[in-house]
Every structure is written in C-alpha cells, then in structure tokens.
C-alpha cells in the first residue's frame, strides 16, 4: 500500500477532484506492479485531450499519468505510444538481435507502464465504456483493503485477457478436457513439448514428480495416460493455485498433489519430469520466470538433484528448447557437459522443430534463430557406479 502525497492537475487533464478515476487528494491507495516497481510518488491526472506526443514527453520526464476519460481512447493512447518508440536496429548476429529486442521490450514496458488507472474498492474502473474489471482483479489480488487501487493500464489489460482465457479454457493436444490458465502462469500454447511427452510410453503405474509444474498440463497428460500419482512443485503461488484448480476440474485431484516449493519434493519417484525456463538471462518481472533462468541456475540445480530424487530404475525426462544455443547465450555442447558433471547419462533423446507462430514469422527480429529452433526430450538416468 502506498500513500499519494499529491495528485497534480495538468493542462491536458480535468480537475482531480472531479475526475471519476483519480484518487482523492492525499488518499491512501494500493499500488500493483508485476515488475515490482515502487509506487508513484505523484500522479498527474490526464484525459482524452492528451496527445500521444505530449504523453511521451511527460512520461520521459518521469511522470505517472493517471488516465480518466474513455477506456478505448486510453487503449489507443498505449498503441500510439508504442508506435513512437524506437525499433531495434538491424543486428549482425542472433545474440545482438536478442539483446536489442530485449532492450526495446523493456523500454516499451517502462514507457507504457506510466499510463495508470484507478479502481474503486470493488475494482471497478471509472472510465467511459470500460468493461467489468472486478472479477479479473479479484482473481489475481483477492479483496481490496483500500478504497482505491492504482495499476498500469497495460497490466490491467493483460489481466482482462487472462480472465477470458480462464473462463473459456484452452484445448491442449493430448489432454482430455480443457485447461483453464490463470493470470501470470505460463500459457501452454506451444504443442511441440506436449507431443514429445506423448511419445514416452512407459507411464502406466508410475509415481511422478513434476518440477516447475506451471498450469499442471504435463502432470495431467501423464495422469490421464495411467500414471499412478503426481507430486508437483512450483515456486510461484499462482501456478500452485492454477494447477490445483485444474486438477479438480479434470477429475484428477485425488492423484495430484502440488506444493509451493523450490525444485524437488521429499522422497523419490519413478519418473521426474521438468520443462524448465530455456533462456539463461535474468527475468525482468514475475511472469518472466517461466522463460528466463538467470545463469541457468534452475536447470543446473535440477540436474544436480535429479539422481537423488529417482527411485531405483527411475528416469528423468527433461524437455528443453535449443534457442539459447542458437542465440549464442549458451555454447554448443554445454548441456551435454552438464549431464556429465551431474553424473547423468542420456538413454535417448527425441527432437522436433518448433511450430509456434514466431518460428514462421519472417518479420520477427529473432527469426533467424527461431526458424531453426528445436525442442528435445531427454531421457536421463544416473551413471552406474
């Protein structure tokens, strides 16, 4: 919770005392930011009269612009600001392209996150033509403890989109029934790793650990194919809640247990499955942790602890994209060297080309690497003494 010292009027905005979406002067408000950015010390009310050029100048000066007016105009302002940001220069290598693209996305995030809106105690948005935001916010934050919540508009739009996915569900190849993902949990829209897991046939009756379960999709596929039980872990409380809810929806709750934990549960399993983050770079926010693994720390620790978590005769299944190698973030042969360091042998490996939309998009800055990306399923066993 943060205290707003002052709300400044501006030439482009209404008087804050009459704005339907501006917090009252000197009122306490709850601030939500996925990137853990500190609460604004000051909010500058603006409305539909604000031009994108003026907004960009003010944001670059460090202002947080509290929008009141029309919801669709506010969304158009975000789009106009995004179009005014510099695009990455043409890179000479995949690594250069990756670095430039990430800097551009960070600049976009920092810029657009300065356009903020306020919600009342029931998380209602006071903009004209605004959708119902109450359910989406309650799903993510729970009940409000203050009369006013302030949030970046871009984040709120992401929450609304996630609430719709959660409502209607997502069909995943190989899964009987729909998956209902939660906000902030990685959306399993890629089918390559699911198809690879389905190629593993020795499932029936196995006790399984699922490390970094996310939505729980890999666990549910294995349970529907005859696994005896799954103990899943994830370091994010949202993923824990999401996977638990989906297990109940799919009628798998009695055979699925999940805990908020770092890596392995206690005991051993016949089968240990992991689809870790595949980019060895620092995450910029909470959602990034599903993709970015700084210095491969998660992957290294998984490989180091795998043998101790396997029952006699058990195997580990590692699903991993080679995009980091193609981008120059890992040298060729790095993973194989890690297997050897951790006393693991590869029983077999199966690969498939990436089939996500970006792999086919020639306009994507990382197309050179993504068009050659492959995902591999490694079957690992401890090296015999």
Which residue ranges define each predicted feature?
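Conserved SAM/SAH cofactor-binding pocket of Class I
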Residues: 190-276, 280-284
């Amino acid at each position: 919770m943060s205290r707003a010292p002052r709300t400044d009027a501006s030439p482009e905005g209404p008087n804050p005392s009459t704005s339907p979406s501006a917090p009252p002067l000197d009122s306490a408000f709850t601030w939500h930011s996925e990137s853990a950015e500190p609460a604004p010390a000051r909010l500058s009310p603006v409305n539909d009269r604000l031009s994108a050029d003026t907004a960009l100048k003010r944001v670059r000066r460090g202002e947080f612009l509290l929008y009141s007016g029309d919801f669709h105009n506010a969304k158009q302002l975000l789009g106009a600001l995004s179009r005014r940001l510099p695009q990455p220069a043409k890179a000479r290598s995949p690594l250069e392209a990756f670095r430039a693209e990430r800097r551009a996305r960070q600049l976009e995030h920092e810029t657009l996150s300065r356009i903020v809106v306020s919600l009342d105690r029931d998380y209602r948005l006071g903009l004209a033509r605004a959708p119902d935001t109450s359910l989406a916010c309650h799903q993510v934050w729970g009940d409000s403890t203050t009369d006013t919540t302030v949030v970046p508009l871009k984040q709120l739009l992401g929450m609304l989109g996630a609430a719709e996915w959660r409502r209607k569900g997502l069909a995943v190849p190989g899964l009987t029934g729909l998956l209902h993902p939660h906000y902030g949990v990685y959306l399993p829209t890629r089918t390559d790793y699911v198809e690879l897991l389905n190629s593993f046939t020795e499932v029936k009756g196995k006790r399984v650990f699922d490390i970094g379960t996310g939505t729980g999709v890999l666990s549910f596929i294995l349970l529907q194919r005859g696994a005896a039980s799954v103990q899943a872990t994830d370091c994010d409380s949202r993923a824990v809640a999401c996977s638990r809810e989906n297990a109940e929806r799919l009628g798998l709750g009695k055979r699925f247990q999940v805990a908020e934990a770092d890596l392995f549960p206690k005991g051993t399993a016949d089968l240990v499955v992991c689809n870790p983050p595949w980019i060895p770079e620092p995450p910029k926010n909470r959602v990034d942790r599903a993709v970015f693994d700084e210095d491969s720390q998660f992957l290294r620790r998984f490989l180091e602890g795998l043998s101790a978590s396997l029952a006699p005769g058990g195997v580990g299944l590692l699903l991993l994209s080679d995009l980091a190698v193609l981008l120059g973030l890992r040298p060729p042969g790095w993973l194989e060297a890690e297997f050897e360091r951790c006393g693991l042998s590869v029983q077999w490996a199966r690969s498939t080309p990436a089939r996500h939309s970006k792999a086919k998009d020639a306009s994507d800055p990382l197309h050179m690497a993504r068009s050659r990306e492959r995902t591999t399923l490694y079957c690992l066993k401890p090296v015999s003494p």
